[in-house]
Amino acid sequence: MREILHIQGGQCGNQIGAKFWEVVCDEHGIDPTGRYTGNSDLQLERVNVYYNEASCGRFVPRAVLMDLEPGTMDSVRTGPYGQIFRPDNFVFGQSGAGNNWAKGHYTEGAELIDSVLDVVRKEAENCDCLQGFQVCHSLGGGTGSGMGTLLISKIREEYPDRMMLTFSVFPSPKVSDTVVEPYNATLSVHQLVENADECMVLDNEALYDICFRTLKLTTPSFGDLNHLISATMSGVTCCLRFPGQLNSDLRKLAVNLIPFPRLHFFMVGFAPLTSRGSQQYRALTVPELTQQMWDAKNMMCAADPRHGRYLTASAMFRGKMSTKEVDEQMINVQNKNSSYFVEWIPNNVKSSVCDIPPRGLSMASTFIGNSTSIQEMFRRVSEQFTAMFRRKAFLHWYTGEGMDEMEFTEAESNMNDLVSEYQQYQDATADEEGEYEDEEQQEADDM
C-alpha cells in the first residue's frame, strides 16, 4: 500500500542512494541479505512502502539503479548492502556521459532509457497502490542530470498522476567538479520546473559546512555528506512507513508546500546534528529540535533563508513527544520571526509527528521549507551560465550531440523567470491585492 519507487542515476545518485538504503534497511531491521532481523512489529507493518517481499521471505528494495558507465554500480554491488538489490534492476551502459548533459539526455542516455523504463514498469506493476517516485541525482554531471531528467519526463508521460519527488544535488558555489556544471544544471532545472512535483535542493558545500561546523569532522568524506542526505530522505517518508499521530505523505506534503506550481524547490534540514563525541551530553527536547531545525546553518543547500521569506514550511517530528508541544513550538517560531514568513499565507507551517525515532536517537525532526531565498542557488548558476554562454564556450560538446543553441537560450530564460517569480512573491504583501483591484476598477470606469 502507498509504495514509493526509488530511482538513482549517475555516480552521485547511486552513492546517495546506496547510503539511503543502508539507513532504511537499518530502520526496518533488514540485514544486508534482505532477511528481517528486527525486534518490533512496527518495522514490518508498512515495510512494503520501500520493499517487495520475495517468495523466500527476503525483502527486496523497490529500487532502480541506472548509470551510463559500470564503475559506480560495481561499487554499489560490492558495497555493504549490494546483495540486497534485484540484479535485473541494475541498468548500465558502457560509454559514460562524460559530464555532458546532451549525451545523457539525447544520445547515450536515449539508447539506454527504454531498458530503464522496462524495469520501472515492472516495479510499478508490482505495486498495490503506487504513490510516487523518488529520484536521486546530481545536476552537475551528465548522467544524473541529462538522463535523470529524460527519465523523469518519460515517467511523467506514463504516470501523470503519481507524485515525482527528486533529491537534486546542485553545483556548489565555490567547489566545482566540472567546468560545464552551469550548463548541465541550467538545462536540468529547465526540465525539473516542468516535470517534477517536489525537488529537495542539496549541495555539497552546505553539507561540508554542516560537517565542519556542527559535526566537527575535520576531513568529511562523501560518505559523511550522503549520510546527512539519507537522514533527511528517511525523515521525509517516515510517516508512510511508521504509525504516527499526524501523518503526511508525498501528496499532502506537496499540497501544503506548493502555493504556485513552478515554485517547488525546497530547502531541507535535519535535527539533531551533534558531533559524534558530544551526543550523550545533551538531552533532546522539542524546543531544542525546533531551534536547530530552523537554524540557517543547518540548511543543506547554499542559500540563506534569512535573505528571503518562507512561503510555506513543513516539519516532521519523530519520536515520543506531545503533539501539543510541537504545535506550540511551531506557532512560536512563526510569531517570533513573523517577518521571515509571507503574511498572505496564514498558518503556513505544517507539522507531522511519527512515533518511531531514527536508530540511536530518542527524537529527531526533518525540516522542509519553501523559501524565496532558494533563488540564490538559481541566480548563481545562471550568472555562471551566462558568462560562458555569451562566449559560446564549450558549446560544441553539446551541439555535437545534436542540441540546438535555442535550447540553451530557452533554459536560460526559464531559469531567470523562476528567479523573478521567487523575487515577486518575496516582495508581495497582503494588502497589495486591494490596490490592483482599485486600479482595475479605475480602468473599467475610464473605458
Swiss-Prot record:
PANTHER family tied to this protein: TUBULIN (PTHR11588)
Keywords from UniProt, A to Z, are: Cytoplasm, Cytoskeleton, GTP-binding, Magnesium, Metal-binding, Microtubule, Nucleotide-binding
Question: What Gene Ontology molecular function terms does this protein carry?
Answer: GTP binding; GTPase activity; metal ion binding; structural constituent of cytoskeleton
| Protein name, per record | Tubulin beta-4 chain
UniProt entry tagged with the keyword Hydrolase: no
**Family in the record:** Belongs to the tubulin family.
Q: Give the gene that encodes this protein.
A: TUBB4
Where along this sequence does the record place binding of Mg(2+)? E69
* Classification via Gene3D superfamilies: Helix hairpin bin, Tubulin/FtsZ, C-terminal domain, Tubulin/FtsZ, GTPase domain
Segment Disordered: which positions? 423-447
Induction cue: Down-regulated by abscisic acid (ABA).
Q: Which segments of the protein form a coiled coil according to its record?
A: none
Which example biological process does GO assign this protein? microtubule cytoskeleton organization
Extract one GO cellular component term from the record. cytoplasm
Which tissues and organs express this gene's product?
Answer: Expressed in roots and leaf sheaths.
Functionally, this protein is described as follows:
Tubulin is the major constituent of microtubules, a cylinder consisting of laterally associated linear protofilaments composed of alpha- and beta-tubulin heterodimers. Microtubules grow by the addition of GTP-tubulin dimers to the microtubule end, where a stabilizing cap forms. Below the cap, tubulin dimers are in GDP-bound state, owing to GTPase activity of alpha-tubulin.
